[in-house]
């Protein structure tokens, strides 16, 4: 159980982070090294893995971080559970763009975990999520957009939702989504499960 005053405080924090999100075209076709970060749980332990992958060769290296998670799962406040561990898992990894398992600005306060991490690290991030948290789906020119209060905040490809976190734009998300679910996140997901079993 989380006190109402704490959630109200966290909402204000999210609105502040959202104001600091920079939406600008990155050009993912220029990315040479891409990072992905994911997390798995066993009890109150979180197992986070950050993966840095060379786009051309597919070679990768990774880093893991295990820590206790005491904040409960509350939709819209995922960053309180996962961001601290994810940030530790990607420290020191070499990459130009970070993909986060979660939402960017396709979030009720435009401050999903990919936006939070992107702003805190001042780094280009894209959120890739498995389910829609907010907004309406609208098909335009063979692309399914996520609209929030009349604004395009994300896109859907297959069963996945892509949204800007920081220092990227919707076009970058479209270019990423067209390629299929990112391999670097598949690897991160596999390694979190492996780390959890060890």
Curated annotation (Swiss-Prot):
One Pfam family recorded for the sequence: Endonuclease_5
Domain of life: Archaea
Transmembrane segments: none
Broad class of where this protein is predominantly found: cytoplasm
Cofactor(s) annotated in UniProt: Mg(2+)
Claim: Transmembrane helix is one of the keywords in the record: no
GO molecular function annotations of the record: deoxyribonuclease V activity; magnesium ion binding; RNA endonuclease activity, producing 5'-phosphomonoesters; single-stranded RNA binding
The protein's Enzyme Commission number: 3.1.21.7
UniProt GO cellular component terms: cytoplasm
InterPro entries: Endonuclease-V (IPR007581)
Reaction(s) the record says it catalyses: Endonucleolytic cleavage at apurinic or apyrimidinic sites to products with a 5'-phosphate
Gene Ontology BP annotations: DNA repair
Binding site for Mg(2+): 38, 101
Site feature location: Interaction with target DNA: 73
Keyword annotations of the record: Cytoplasm, DNA damage, DNA repair, Endonuclease, Hydrolase, Magnesium, Metal-binding, Nuclease
Covalent S-S links between cysteines: none
Subcellular location: Cytoplasm
Protein role: DNA repair enzyme involved in the repair of deaminated bases. Selectively cleaves double-stranded DNA at the second phosphodiester bond 3' to a deoxyinosine leaving behind the intact lesion on the nicked DNA.
Family: Belongs to the endonuclease V family.
Name the UniProt record assigns to this protein: Endonuclease V
Gene: nfi
């Amino acid at each position: 159980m989380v006190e109402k005053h704490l959630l109200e405080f966290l909402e204000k924090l999210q609105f502040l982070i959202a104001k600091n999100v920079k939406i600008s075209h990155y050009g993912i076709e220029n990315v040479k090294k891409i990072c992905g970060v994911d997390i798995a749980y066993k009890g109150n332990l979180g197992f986070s893995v950050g993966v840095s992958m060379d786009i051309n060769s597919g070679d990768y290296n990774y880093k893991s971080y295990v820590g206790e998670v005491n904040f409960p799962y509350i939709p819209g406040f995922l960053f309180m559970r996962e961001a601290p561990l994810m940030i530790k898992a990607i420290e020191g990894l070499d990459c130009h763009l970070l993909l986060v398992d979660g939402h960017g600005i396709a979030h009720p306060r435009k401050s999903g975990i990919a936006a939070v991490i992107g702003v805190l690290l001042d780094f280009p991030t894209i959120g890739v999520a498995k389910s829609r948290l907010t907004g309406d789906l609208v098909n335009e020119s063979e692309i399914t957009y996520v609209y929030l209060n009349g604004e395009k905040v994300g896109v859907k490809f297959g069963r996945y939702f892509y949204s800007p976190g920081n220092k990227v734009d919707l076009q970058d998300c479209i270019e990423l989504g067209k390629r299929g679910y990112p391999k670097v996140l598949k690897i991160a997901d596999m390694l979190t499960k492996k780390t959890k079993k060890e």
